Design a protein with these regions (language model features):
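Sec-dependent signal peptide recognition
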Residues: 2-7
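Hydrophobic h-region of N-terminal signal peptides that target proteins for export
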Residues: 10-16
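Metallo-beta-lactamase
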Residues: 16-110, 114-120, 158-226, 245-252, 304-326, 330-332, ...
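Cap/insert and terminal regions of metallo-dependent hydrolase folds
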Residues: 17-28, 121, 126, 133, ...
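Catalytic core of the metallo-beta-lactamase
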Residues: 32, 81-84, 183-245, 261, ...
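Active-site metal-binding motif and surrounding structural segment of the metallo-beta-lactamase
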Residues: 34, 105-156, 172, 242-248
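A short acidic, amphipathic alpha-helical/loop segment
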Residues: 140-145, 164, 168-169, 233-237
Length: 333
């Protein structure tokens, strides 16, 4: 019974990628992906995902938010990244909860605490949300950020999500469609297409946009891919923007490939995406944080990334991995 309930919870946030006439679609056609219940059956049959004895152990680092490091990037965990540039602090896909789920007692569970937690952050000026899946849009996290001392950050969200924020009492929200942009305190904020999908309930699949974000400042150009399968969208983004000082690409939640390929890149595809967008450096995200999302070990993505870097002739610094909470200073342009 417990397995059946957990599968239903997962179905609310996974399922198939489809689009009716009134629903958003990806830019580049792909087969409609079905087979969620087949995947769940295979997990049950094969005892996946397999976990190490004693559970996962990840080393965390103490974040450094000193002004001397600006611009800088801190990986808090999963797709939550703090970028500091020009006196601004910008947070991506804030997820600080114990579970990535519509309920608190089931669903993918955190194996390492957010580093730092919400109370350890500097004042957040802006938040960008890639899409509405529970591991990227967390109700408790965004409501606490909106109530931070000194006032709410400005939330930049995909088309169709502003109404959800309004229902939570969050008013400082800018909603954008693909290729639209706004300027905020000297920072250009662009919403760009990536290949993924959206779903938050059993009936709202693909009723809101999904995408990545480009942040452009005189001191830093940054591309946040959010959650994405590999597609020609990355080449399109390079054609528009030329390249980036830093990109953040997902490298985890990719097995089994027959089911996950459309929606989640693997490390080899992430390396190709790094090349496609012409990033000087890339940061690995979307791995090592929540257990139970897909079949591969949480330890596997950075190991495979190291192999793919070597094959592509990239250095560790060109596509780097941070510990949870670790801050990296970025060279000025």
């Amino acid at each position: 019974l417990k397995r059946a309930f957990l599968a239903l919870v997962a179905g609310a946030v996974a399922g198939c990628v489809s689009a009716g006439a009134d629903r958003f679609r990806n830019n580049y056609p792909h087969p409609e992906k079905t087979g969620f219940w087949k995947w769940k059956w295979e997990q049950w049959r094969d005892g996946l995902p397999r976990r190490p004895e004693g559970g996962y152990r990840f080393e965390t680092a103490k974040s450094d938010f000193s002004a001397a490091l600006n611009p800088s990037v801190t990986w808090i965990g999963h797709a939550t990244v703090l970028v500091r540039v020009g006196g601004l602090s910008i947070l991506t896909d804030p997820q600080f909860s114990e579970r990535a789920s519509p309920v608190r007692f089931a669903g993918p569970r955190r194996v390492v605490p957010p580093a730092p937690g919400l109370d350890g952050l500097p004042h957040i000026d802006a938040v960008v949300i890639s899409h509405n899946h529970y591991d990227h849009l967390d109700l408790d996290s965004v409501t606490k950020l909106a109530a931070q001392p000194g006032g709410s950050p400005r939330f930049f969200v995909p088309l169709g999500l502003k109404d959800w924020f309004s229902r939570q009492g969050i008013a400082d929200v800018v909603e954008l469609d693909w290729w639209q942009s706004r300027t905020f305190k000297g920072l250009e904020v662009h919403f760009v297409p990536v290949q993924h999908w959206s779903k938050r309930t059993l009936t709202d699949e693909n009723l809101t946009r999904w995408g990545g974000w480009v942040l452009r400042h005189p001191e830093l150009s940054f591309f946040f891919a959010g959650d994405a399968g590999y597609s020609k969208d990355f080449a399109d983004i390079r054609a528009r923007f030329g390249g980036f000082d830093l990109a953040a690409f997902p490298i985890g939640a990719y097995e089994p490939r027959w089911f996950m390929k459309i929606m989640h890149m693997n490390p080899a595809e992430a390396v190709q995406a790094h090349k496609d967008v012409n990033a000087r450096q890339s940061l690995a995200i979307h791995w090592g944080t929540f257990d139970g999302m897909t079949d591969e070990s949480l330890y596997e993505p950075p190991q495979r990334l190291a192999e793919e870097r070597r094959k592509a002739g990239l250095s560790d610094e060109q596509f780097f991995v941070l510990k949870h909470g670790e801050t990296r200073s970025l060279a000025h342009r």
